[in-house]
From Swiss-Prot:
Domain of life: Eukaryota
UniProt keyword annotation of Secreted present: yes
Protein's UniProt name: Bradykinin-potentiating peptide 13c
UniProt keyword Secreted, yes or no: yes
Species: Bothrops jararaca
């Protein structure tokens, strides 16, 4: 907890 939400990780090619 206490962490900002991270952006979605795109799938690797």
């Amino acid at each position: 907890q206490g962490r900002p939400p991270h952006p979605p990780i795109p799938p690797a090619p």
